[in-house]
Amino acid sequence: MCHTSCSSGCQPSCCVSSSCQPSCCVSSPCQASCFVSSPCQPSCCVSSSCQSACCRPAICIPVRYQVACCVPVSCGPTVCMAPSCQSSVCVPVSCRPVCVTSSCQSSGCCQPSCPTLVCKPVTCSNPSCC
């Protein structure tokens, strides 16, 4: 399914792989996450360096963390990169992140399950991913 209900400034949507959540695409280079009207609906950012990406719900990306980075479709979720800590990945404080695959750990490929975020180092070598 394609979504066309992106917020102002976003371009018409396009479809990504069926293995991804429904998402909207913006023209590259991507400047910020593209949020749909409801905080419960999916959002995404597809930059020129990221051909396609899976996106997590907008409720997991507070407005203050609008700058997002994309990971390959095979990795599953995107991670939130806070402007104030560019060398860190923002992961939940009150719940454990879930590592997707071992090949993604060097990118900090973790999926938060709640919206309260804290900055942790990107470099993680243990199975719990930080």
UniProtKB/Swiss-Prot annotation:
Looking up InterPro entries in the UniProt record yields: KAP
| One annotated Gene Ontology cellular component of this protein | keratin filament
Annotated segments matching region 14 X 5 AA approximate repeats? 10-128
- Residue spans of the sequence repeats: 10-14, 15-29, 34-38, 40-44, 45-49, 60-64, 85-89, 90-94, 95-99, 104-108, 109-113, 114-118, 119-123, 124-128
- Tissues where this protein is expressed: Expressed only in the head and back skin of a 3 day old mouse. Not expressed in adult skin.
Q: List UniProt keywords, sorted A-Z.
A: Keratin, Repeat
Q: How does it assemble?
A: Interacts with hair keratins.
Q: Briefly, what is this protein's role?
A: In the hair cortex, hair keratin intermediate filaments are embedded in an interfilamentous matrix, consisting of hair keratin-associated proteins (KRTAP), which are essential for the formation of a rigid and resistant hair shaft through their extensive disulfide bond cross-linking with abundant cysteine residues of hair keratins. The matrix proteins include the high-sulfur and high-glycine-tyrosine keratins.
Q: Report the sequence similarity comment from the record.
A: Belongs to the KRTAP type 12 family.
Q: What is this protein called?
A: Keratin-associated protein 12-1
